[in-house]
């Protein structure tokens, strides 16, 4: 088994590399050197993930629990750990400093390790040891779960050198901070096992798991990769739409359009296997238990033995009109007394795509062919229906549909290439969206500041970033401090307190996890931010709990808006 120290050494090497090609070479060499059992684990670890995106397992360790584990393992007080976070600005460097200053208190350490019937201080830990402890942590719940998680974390830190602890601490909150994303890992797998990058990408699209793809590439190359299949209850990334400046531009780009309403709802991916139904949010979280009405509608009205469907769940009032987006999020968050919430906020499901049907993968088929099969297997009713679609290249017809969608209280229209296949996780011109001119941006919160005066205990100013899909980095684009109520600031402070990965004075660095919908007056060129742009008069519109950080606006989109402003 490979020692975790070897993984930490590779991470340290990568952290000092700026070239994506050099990073790819280092990751490739590491993937070639490890066992098949370790391969999927390391593939995820090097991206800062513990489990694949589709997995129901969630590590769920917040910074407060991590601080406590470092305190217990090092013998430093909790305040000393918090002070180290402020002085170093990084939880990894905090772990290095804390374990470097480790106080000699053998009695305390031995007591904390008795649960494991082994002396952690006397053994080195392997990569698989770390993964198995993380797996145990993810499965603890209920009374006593925090102390059980704590004991596992203590074991790991007591088994680690201070250098190993740097990456162990970061991995615990799934933010490795070495700049390795999916693109680099895809290319590293390709190079390590001599499989074309396109085949690796194809396998990833079908499985949503680069770990599985890496194992297939190692064991059988292209032949084994070609055997990878989409599977029920393993959600794949959802295809994304690009904003079009006008309907005329969309027709120029695509010619004939498949026009659909863009509903003001929450996107879902539904997996049906007989009467077993699982529903996943656009962040690939399993929300089945919160949506029993959608489950029942699919059972009754989708006539297929097995299927993977996509659609929008829309909250409606007594007249069938759409309710506020926040009401939908209440449904998705609800875990207790769900039936009461079902009565208070009923949902309808508008289906628009099908990716899998009765054992056949459909995503390579055209949108029109997929839609034919979707229509054939769904019985439309009040609770579930296939979204209406019109094929046209007439600007006036599209404008009429657009106006009808807006008058119905929805966001606008989707303009799709009727001949396009389905591309998981890809944003491009095959799917376009047209919304009103007052555009908003979905941006990731990467840092923040504690407030002043009566708001001193609240986080009140947030640093925003767009996404660069080429290297998986988040690029700062400005700050927002307006549009928040005191109640909202209190709620957000509670959320962000568990995402702190560094602190210096009033400034805090956050794990990129939360997406804000931001209104703005203008995008300007700026040398103050890493994106090269800044927002003029940004203000909060919504917290987009349904969106993942990687679904934030891309740097290309920011540049496009900037150029369009200039005419």
Swiss-Prot record:
Enzyme class: ligase
PROSITE patterns named in the record: DNA_LIGASE_A1, DNA_LIGASE_A3
Pfam families reported in the protein's UniProt record: DNA_ligase_A_C, DNA_ligase_A_M, DNA_ligase_A_N
Domain of life: Archaea
The protein's Enzyme Commission number: 6.5.1.1
Annotated positions binding ATP: 260, 267, 282, 312, 352, 427, 433
Cofactor section: Mg(2+)
Active site: 262 (n6-amp-lysine intermediate)
GO molecular function: ATP binding; DNA binding; DNA ligase (ATP) activity; metal ion binding
Chemical reaction(s) catalysed: ATP + (deoxyribonucleotide)n-3'-hydroxyl + 5'-phospho-(deoxyribonucleotide)m = (deoxyribonucleotide)n+m + AMP + diphosphate
Function noted in UniProt: DNA ligase that seals nicks in double-stranded DNA during DNA replication, DNA recombination and DNA repair.
PANTHER family xrefs: DNA LIGASE (PTHR45674:SF7), DNA LIGASE 1/3 FAMILY MEMBER (PTHR45674)
HAMAP family: DNA_ligase
Family under the similarity heading: Belongs to the ATP-dependent DNA ligase family.
Protein name: DNA ligase
């Amino acid at each position: 088994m490979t020692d975790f120290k070897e993984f930490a050494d590779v991470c340290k090497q990568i952290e000092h590399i700026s070239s994506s090609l050099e990073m790819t070479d280092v990751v490739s060499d590491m993937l070639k050197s490890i066992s098949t059992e370790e391969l999927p684990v390391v593939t995820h670890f090097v991206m800062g993930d513990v489990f694949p995106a589709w997995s129901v397992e969630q590590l769920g360790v917040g910074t407060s629990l991590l601080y406590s584990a470092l305190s217990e393992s090092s013998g430093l007080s909790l305040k000393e750990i918090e002070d180290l976070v402020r002085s170093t600005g990084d939880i990894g460097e905090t772990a290095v400093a804390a374990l470097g200053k480790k106080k000699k208190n053998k009695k305390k350490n031995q007591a904390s390790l008795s649960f494991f019937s082994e002396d952690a201080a006397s053994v080195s830990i392997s990569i698989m040891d770390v993964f198995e402890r993380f797996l145990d942590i993810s499965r603890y719940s209920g009374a006593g779960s925090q102390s059980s998680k704590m004991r596992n974390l203590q074991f790991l830190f007591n088994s680690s050198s201070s250098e190993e602890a740097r990456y162990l601490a970061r991995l615990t909150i799934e933010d490795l901070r070495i700049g390795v994303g999916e693109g680099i890992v895809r290319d590293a797998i390709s190079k390590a096992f001599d499989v074309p990058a396109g085949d690796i990408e194809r396998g990833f699209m079908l499985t949503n798991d680069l770990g599985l793809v890496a194992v297939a590439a190692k064991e059988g190359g292209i032949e084994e990769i070609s055997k990878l299949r989409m599977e029920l209850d393993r959600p794949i990334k959802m295809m994304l739409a690009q904003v079009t400046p006008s309907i005329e531009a969309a027709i120029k780009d695509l010619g004939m359009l498949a026009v659909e309403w863009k509903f003001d709802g929450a996107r879902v991916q539904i997996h049906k296997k007989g009467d077993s139904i699982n529903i996943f949010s656009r962040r690939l979280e399993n929300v089945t238990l919160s949506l029993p009405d959608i489950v029942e509608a699919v059972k009754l009205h989708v006539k297929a033995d097995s299927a993977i469907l996509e659609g929008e769940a829309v909250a409606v009032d007594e007249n069938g009109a759409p309710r506020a987006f926040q009401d939908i999020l209440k449904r998705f968050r609800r875990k207790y007394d769900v039936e009461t919430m079902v009565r208070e906020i009923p949902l309808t499901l508008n289906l628009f795509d099908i990716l899998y049907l009765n054992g056949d993968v459909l995503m390579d088929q055209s949108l029109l062919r997929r839609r034919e099969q979707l229509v054939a297997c769904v019985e439309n009713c009040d609770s579930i229906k296939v979204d209406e679609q019109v094929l046209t290249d007439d600007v006036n017809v599209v404008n009429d549909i657009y106006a009808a969608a807006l008058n119905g209280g929805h966001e606008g229209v989707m303009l799709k290439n009727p001949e396009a296949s389905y591309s998981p996780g890809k944003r491009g011109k095959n799917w376009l969206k047209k919304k009103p001119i007052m555009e908003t941006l979905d941006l990731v919160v990467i840092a923040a500041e504690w407030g002043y005066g009566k708001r001193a205990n609240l986080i009140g100013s947030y640093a925003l970033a767009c996404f660069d899909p080429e290297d998986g980095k988040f690029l700062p684009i400005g700050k927002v401090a307006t549009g928040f109520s005191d109640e909202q600031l209190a709620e957000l402070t509670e959320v962000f307190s568990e995402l702190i990965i560094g602190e210096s004075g009033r400034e805090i660095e956050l794990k990129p996890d939360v997406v804000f919908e931001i209104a703005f007056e203008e995008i300007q060129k700026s040398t103050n931010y890493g994106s090269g742009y800044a927002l003029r008069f940004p203000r909060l519109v919504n917290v987009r709990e349904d969106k993942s950080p990687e679904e934030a606006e891309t740097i290309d989109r920011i540049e496009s808006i900037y150029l369009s402003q200039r005419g």
